[in-house]
């Protein structure tokens, strides 16, 4: 991936090369532009394409929310599985974050100097991983996927994707920000990635599988796309 600043608008432009035929532009949260381009297209062609869309970018940029910036302080609102929680920040014996037995979202700090953001995100990773593991158990059974096909699941910060599947190795990655989204959206992403074990790319066969296993996947996808990213 390469990054440059468009001189006409001042927007950050992220360029991702893929085996596609055309150049596509997308407006992302945080007032940035994502360009997916064919691998053989020159950087000059990409820059010219962005420059030719200045009016379009300016129009749609006004509709995109600013990137959410958290301070990780008591009372700040965070979402877990689509539900809003006021954060409680406490001092305790060890650094950790999660939902308490009383249903409260807590960030526990060993000292006031502890890295709040890192501790919070680590706690959210654990929460999301547990949910995704449950989804894998449910859907690998329904889709008759052998356990040996799944070799690893990781959670990481992903700015432009919700998940990825390496079908050859059986390794999956999911965006940490999914922890803020409703469970039905998380399930849709899991099924999406599992379908890639049977169909590479987004072919007609792939979408036939999605329709078979999750008939309302488009509705779930629209809901997911409508929600702002929080943990990126």
List where the protein language model places each region.
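Active-site-proximal or metal-binding-adjacent scaffold patches in catalytic folds
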Residues: 1-188, 197-232
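Walker B catalytic acidic pair
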Residues: 193
């Amino acid at each position: 991936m390469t990054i440059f600043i468009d001189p006409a608008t001042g927007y950050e432009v992220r360029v991702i090369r893929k085996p596609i035929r055309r150049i596509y532009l997308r407006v992302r949260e945080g007032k940035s532009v994502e360009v997916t381009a064919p691998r053989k297209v020159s950087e000059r062609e990409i820059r010219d394409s962005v420059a030719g869309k200045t009016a379009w970018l300016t129009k749609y940029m006004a509709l995109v929310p600013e990137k959410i910036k958290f301070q990780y302080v008591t009372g700040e609102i965070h979402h877990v599985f689509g539900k809003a929680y006021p954060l409680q920040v406490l001092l305790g014996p060890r650094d950790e974050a999660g939902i308490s037995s009383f249903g409260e979202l807590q960030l526990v700090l060993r000292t006031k100097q502890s890295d709040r953001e890192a501790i919070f995100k680590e706690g959210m990773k654990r929460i999301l991983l547990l949910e995704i593991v449950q989804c894998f158990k449910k859907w690998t059974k329904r889709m008759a996927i052998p356990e040996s096909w799944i070799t690893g699941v990781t959670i990481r910060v992903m700015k432009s994707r919700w998940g990825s599947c390496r079908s050859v190795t059986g390794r999956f990655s999911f965006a940490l920000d999914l922890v803020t989204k409703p469970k039905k959206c998380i399930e849709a992403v899991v099924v999406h990635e599992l379908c890639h074990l049977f169909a590479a790319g987004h072919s007609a066969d792939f979408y036939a599988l999605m329709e078979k296993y999750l008939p309302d996947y488009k509705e779930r996808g629209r809901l997911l796309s409508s929600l702002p990213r929080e943990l990126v």
